[in-house]
Amino acid sequence: MADVLDLHEAGGEDFAMDEDGDESIHKLKEKAKKRKGRGFGADEGTRTRIREDYDSVEQDGDEPGPQRSVEGWILFVTGVHEEATEEDIHDKFGEFGEIKNIHLNLDRRTGFLKGYALVEYETYKEALAAMEGLNGQDLMGQPVSVDWGFVRGPPKGKRRSGRRRSRSPERRRR
């Protein structure tokens, strides 16, 4: 069996509690602020400063609008012909400004295009001009639809309170 050391008998002075320690702990706890949650309720000045760091387009009314991605302004092009190439899309969209990036997804099984493309412009004006100029236009004999890749949702401040759906009827017990 292992030897058991009784702390109260041998060397009890090493483990003695400091009487003043309790008072200092209470003083520290009184000065500390009690905080809950994430971010600890940062002041409004910090939030507005953070919002100013990002590019955005002024929003008219309550409609959702375009939002800039980290890299640039991305357009989502649907209805692209399955045999279209990156050069075909670059030729068509390059008329409206310098294209930063084009992304085409291919179907692994067939090797053809999946029917959509992502076209990225550096500036909002170029992306808007391309969207307005090419939405509904033909690309390789098929009409394409052009819209923003990222959009802002509706404003958060105008939510109505309460339930959004009606409740299901109570189950009958037999």
Swiss-Prot record:
Primary role: Required for pre-mRNA splicing as component of the spliceosome. Core component of the splicing-dependent multiprotein exon junction complex (EJC) deposited at splice junctions on mRNAs. The EJC is a dynamic structure consisting of core proteins and several peripheral nuclear and cytoplasmic associated factors that join the complex only transiently either during EJC assembly or during subsequent mRNA metabolism.
Stretches with biased composition (Basic and acidic residues): 1-11, 44-54
GO cellular component: cytoplasm; exon-exon junction complex; nuclear speck; nucleus; U2-type catalytic step 1 spliceosome
Intracellular or extracellular location(s): Nucleus; Nucleus speckle; Cytoplasm
Organism for this UniProt entry: Xenopus laevis
A Pfam short name: RRM_1
Record keywords, A-Z: Cytoplasm, mRNA processing, mRNA splicing, mRNA transport, Nonsense-mediated mRNA decay, Nucleus, RNA-binding, Spliceosome, Translation regulation, Transport
Bias-annotated ranges (Basic residues): 28-38, 155-174
RRM domain: residues covered: 73-151
Family: Belongs to the RBM8A family.
PROSITE patterns xref list: RRM
Protein name: RNA-binding protein 8A-B
Gene Ontology terms: biological process: mRNA splicing, via spliceosome; mRNA transport; nuclear-transcribed mRNA catabolic process, nonsense-mediated decay; regulation of alternative mRNA splicing, via spliceosome; regulation of translation; RNA splicing
Subunit structure comment from the entry: Part of the mRNA splicing-dependent exon junction complex (EJC) complex; the core complex contains casc3, eif4a3, magoh, and rbm8a. Identified in the spliceosome C complex. Associates with polysomes.
PANTHER family in the record: RNA-BINDING PROTEIN 8A (PTHR45894)
Segments for region (Disordered): 1-70, 149-174
GO molecular function list: mRNA binding
Cysteine disulfide links: none
